[in-house]
């Protein structure tokens, strides 16, 4: 991230001020063009504000064509084999004194989908140009999944009663990617229709895939079903985007700046830093949720149970999502009435004697036993039993 003076002022799209840009112009039919440009934005809006403004009569007509275009782009992306997994992010509201006032999950607004499709198209166009001319840059690559991982995913989903496509007798990486895309669509459809496994089943699909990363060569992006992909649209937020901008401008004859000397090392470094930043973000979410849960229990009482969903399991216990945004750990030692063992697929925990079973995606009622706010850890116990 650039210093705030640059990222929030000099390089930021401030309303009614000129800013230097690089434009990707993409006609519905024909090749894209790339050029330096100047932009003067009229407003700085959050996605929520943009969503509300879209209903204004003067804006409806202007966005109607854009909506149709981006909807078509989205449909074509899924038709060519892009993954269809929805993972709503947790949003926080703070009280102005450093405390967390509330947290909620929000489905993707229309304004976000519109911007997302245009950014994907721009990123693809730039990557296609650089790749076709064998230019060095930092590509965003997502390699095809390991066939054995997809075979295991199919077995897990079948064991959980989730409809899956028939698996080919032999899976190559290419067919594994196609099966993964098909599975992602079926899982999301099943979750919407049944209301079961809302958190657990999409997570199973994601964990069966390889991680996206940066690489100096174009290896394609399986998740987006893109032949070539890069990060181009956020040069004030991500360093790889800045490298791509420089590569594009050099290719267009608008800059003489050479590419970095060690692109391979830079790709590894930026990929590592991205994962580290994601881990910090996850920890920050856990800490905020721990404090919010403690405040919530202070008001409602610790004896009031939560409805939850089993979203993960290991031999020593269950991971539960509850209260929509909170997550906690239910140790197996707190499961009473039997001795429970994890099955070979890691999809269920069954009692040796009575046969009582806990499965991924099952509902479960829990009580909070302990919160370690400094670590964001929550320990749970079972308030009621899942189905037998």
Residue ranges and their predicted role:
Residues 1-388:
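Conserved, carboxylate-rich catalytic/transport cores that coordinate ions
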């Amino acid at each position: 991230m650039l210093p705030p003076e640059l990222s929030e002022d000099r390089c930021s799209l401030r309303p009614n001020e000129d800013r230097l840009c690089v434009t990707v112009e993409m006609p519905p039919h024909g090749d894209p063009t790339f050029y330096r440009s100047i932009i003067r934005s009229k407003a700085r809006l959050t996605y929520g504000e943009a969503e509300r403004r879209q209903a204004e009569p003067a804006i409806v007509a202007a966005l109607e064509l854009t909506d149709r275009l981006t909807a078509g782009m989205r449909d074509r992306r899924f038709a060519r084999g892009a993954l269809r997994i929805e993972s709503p992010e947790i949003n926080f509201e703070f009280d102005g004194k450093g405390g967390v006032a509330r947290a909620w999950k929000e489905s993707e607004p229309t304004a976000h989908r519109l911007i997302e499709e245009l950014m994907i198209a721009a990123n693809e166009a730039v990557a296609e140009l650089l790749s076709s001319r064998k230019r060095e840059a930092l590509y965003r690559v997502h390699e095809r999944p390991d066939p054995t991982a997809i075979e295991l995913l199919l077995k897990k989903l079948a064991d959980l009663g989730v409809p899956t496509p028939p698996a080919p007798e032999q899976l190559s990486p290419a067919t594994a990617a196609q099966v993964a895309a098909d599975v992602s669509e079926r899982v999301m459809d099943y979750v919407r229709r049944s209301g079961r496994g809302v958190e657990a089943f999409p997570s199973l699909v994601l964990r069966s895939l390889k991680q996206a990363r940066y690489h100096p060569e174009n290896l394609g992006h399986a998740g987006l079903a893109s032949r070539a992909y890069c990060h181009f649209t956020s040069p004030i937020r991500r360093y790889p985007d800045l490298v791509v901008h420089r590569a594009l401008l050099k290719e267009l004859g608008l800059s003489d700046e050479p590419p970095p000397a060690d692109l391979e090392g830079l790709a590894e470094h930026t990929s590592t830093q991205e994962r580290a930043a994601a881990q910090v973000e996850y920890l920050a979410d856990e800490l905020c949720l721990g404090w919010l849960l403690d405040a919530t229990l202070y008001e409602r009482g610790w004896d009031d149970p939560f409805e939850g969903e089993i979203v993960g399991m290991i031999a020593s216990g269950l991971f539960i999502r509850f209260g929509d945004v909170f997550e906690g750990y239910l140790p197996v030692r707190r499961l009473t009435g039997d001795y429970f063992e994890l099955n070979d697929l890691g999809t269920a925990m069954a009692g040796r004697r009575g046969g009582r079973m806990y499965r991924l995606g099952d509902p479960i009622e829990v009580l909070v036993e302990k919160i370690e706010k400094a670590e964001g850890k929550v320990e749970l116990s079972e308030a009621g039993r899942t189905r037998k």
